[in-house]
């Protein structure tokens, strides 16, 4: 085995402990990760600001600057932050607002700050929130959406629209790797639906999940759902199928691609309610060695070996909605958030321990073509994927604060980080 030079060993140790280089000096926060530190791209820096959580998933700020965290298996926490500028933040208080071990992922807060929404596998709850006292009265809990229980994919992502603040979107995944019930729109499986919560009177029963406006179906597990602030476009990121074969040949290593899907604009039926193909059709990522490739290109849909009789590659590309972009197989995208001018979407890749950016144009669409394999640009990565998933950060939820810093959760490590663009080359302080 070749021996590394002393300076190489020192550099490797430095990256392990501190990331690609040192971030701004911060005397109020000396937290460090206990695994190989993530590496920030040029022009970015990050800092670990909270540890000791159980499994932090969705995160969102309240109007007074408190960071609300859906800590799966615990409930909803509120972190009070001391802000010394840049990435120099630290947590001065960690309070449990809602204690409910059934809460597992979804979290949203109303535009007026007075209502917190959180989800279990079966229900979406609304709680009255007092932002002045930073408290929730548990007796105010009300079920607003119900009847969502299924096995396998049990998270229920929540998004409150900024364009139409009374519209609550809920994403529900499949009950199996390839779920035959998802072929039936009345099953509610593998769908995103929207609900006008302003129409729910105090004495009304909750919405049944399948009663919501259909935003999209044939979506295996679209955990990440986001809204482009410039035009209100709704986007989701799809976790596609595992263990895929094509004409009996194992192609699962690089196919199918994970997906970025467009669902139109709330209040406008164009591009809304379409079927995206699951479980009959999947999107092509790698063409190398793909059986019966024919004229298929990256991003095209192809028929599953288990597809309904009569479904072919041709019908997959004419009868179903194609993804706008595809990503490497099995990166497991879990959230998508846009910057304020809608020029960039940020996406967490839970499976590959990355945070990436995707460029958007003034038309509200990605600037990359549908067949691109380079649309996702790494912002934060793990230095050694051979150590994953046991010894890596695993990003889940994203949220921006009022000055544009990007915060994210890492569920397997129980951590919260802050990430921002900097004037220096790539840096970080794990």
Curated annotation (Swiss-Prot):
Q: Which keywords are on file for this protein? A: Calcium, Disulfide bond, Glycoprotein, Metal-binding, Oxidoreductase, Secreted, Signal
- Which of this chain's residues are annotated to bind pyrroloquinoline quinone? 57, 153, 220, 330, 350
This protein's name? Pyrroloquinoline quinone-dependent sugar dehydrogenase
Q: Where in the cell is it found?
A: Secreted
Question: What is stated about domains?
Answer: In contrast to Coprinopsis cinerea PDH, the first AA12 family member which has been characterized, Hypocrea jecorina AA12 contains only the PQQ-dependent dehydrogenase domain (AA12 domain) which is not flanked by an N-terminal cytochrome domain (found in AA8 family enzymes) domain and a C-terminal CBM1 domain.
Q: Which Gene3D superfamilies match?
A: TolB, C-terminal domain
> How does changing the pH alter activity?
Optimum pH is 4.5.
Give the Gene Ontology MF terms in alphabetical order. metal ion binding; oxidoreductase activity
Pfam families tied to this protein: TrAA12
Source organism of the structure: Hypocrea jecorina (strain QM6a) (Trichoderma reesei)
One GO cellular-component annotation of the UniProt record comes to:
extracellular region
Endpoints of the signal sequence: 1-23
* Positions annotated with a glycan in the UniProt record: 25, 94, 147, 184, 306, 341
Q: What is its EC number?
A: 1.1.99.-
Residues that coordinate or bind Ca(2+): 240, 242
Q: What does this protein do?
A: Pyrroloquinoline quinone (PPQ)-dependent oxidoreductase that catalyzes the oxidation of various sugars such as L-fucose.
Tell me its cofactors.
Answer: Ca(2+); pyrroloquinoline quinone
Q: Listed disulfide bonds for this chain?
A: 281-316, 388-392
In the record, the note on similarity to other proteins reads: Belongs to the sugar dehydrogenase AA12 family.
């Amino acid at each position: 085995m070749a021996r590394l030079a002393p300076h190489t060993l020192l550099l490797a140790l430095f990256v392990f402990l501190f990331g690609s280089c040192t971030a701004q000096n911060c005397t109020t926060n000396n937290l460090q990760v206990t695994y190989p530190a993530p590496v920030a791209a040029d022009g970015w820096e990050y800092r670990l600001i909270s540890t000791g959580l159980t499994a932090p998933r969705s995160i969102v700020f309240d109007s007074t600057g408190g960071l609300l965290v859906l800590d799966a298996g615990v409930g909803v926490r509120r972190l009070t932050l001391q802000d010394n500028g840049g990435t120099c933040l630290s947590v001065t208080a960690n309070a449990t607002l809602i204690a409910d071990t059934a809460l597992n992922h979804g979290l949203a807060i109303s535009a007026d700050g007075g209502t917190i929404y959180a989800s279990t596998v079966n229900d979406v709850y609304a709680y009255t929130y007092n932002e002045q006292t930073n408290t929730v009265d548990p007796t105010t809990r009300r079920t607003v959406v119900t009847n969502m229980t299924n096995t396998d994919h049990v998270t229920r992502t929540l998004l409150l629209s900024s364009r139409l603040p009374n519209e609550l979107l809920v994403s529900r995944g499949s009950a199996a790797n390839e779920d035959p019930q998802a072929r039936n729109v009345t099953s509610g499986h593998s769908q995103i639906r929207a609900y006008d919560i302003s129409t729910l009177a105090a004495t009304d029963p909750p919405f049944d999940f399948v009663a919501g406006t259909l935003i999209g179906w044939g979506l295996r597990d679209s955990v990440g759902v986001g809204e482009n602030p410039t035009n209100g476009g709704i986007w989701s990121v799809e976790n596609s199928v595992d263990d895929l074969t094509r004409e009996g040949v194992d192609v699962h290593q690089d196919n199918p691609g994970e997906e970025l899907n467009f669902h139109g604009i709330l209040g406008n039926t164009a591009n809304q309610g379409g079927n995206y193909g699951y479980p009959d059709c999947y999107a092509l990522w790698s063409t190398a060695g793909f059986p019966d490739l024919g004229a298929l290109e990256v991003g095209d849909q192809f028929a599953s070996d288990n597809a309904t009789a009569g479904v072919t590659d041709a019908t997959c590309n004419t009868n179903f909605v194609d993804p706008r972009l595809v990503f490497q197989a099995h990166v497991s995208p879990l959230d998508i958030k846009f910057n304020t001018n809608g020029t960039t979407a940020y996406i967490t890749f839970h499976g590959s321990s990355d945070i990436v950016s995707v460029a958007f144009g003034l038309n509200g669409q990605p600037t990359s073509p549908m067949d691109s394999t380079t649309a996702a640009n790494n912002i934060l990565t793990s230095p050694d994927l051979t150590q994953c998933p046991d010894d890596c950060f695993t990003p889940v939820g994203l949220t921006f604060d009022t000055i544009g810093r990007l915060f994210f959760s890492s569920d397997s490590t129980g951590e919260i980080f802050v990430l921002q663009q900097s004037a220096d080359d790539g840096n970080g302080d794990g």
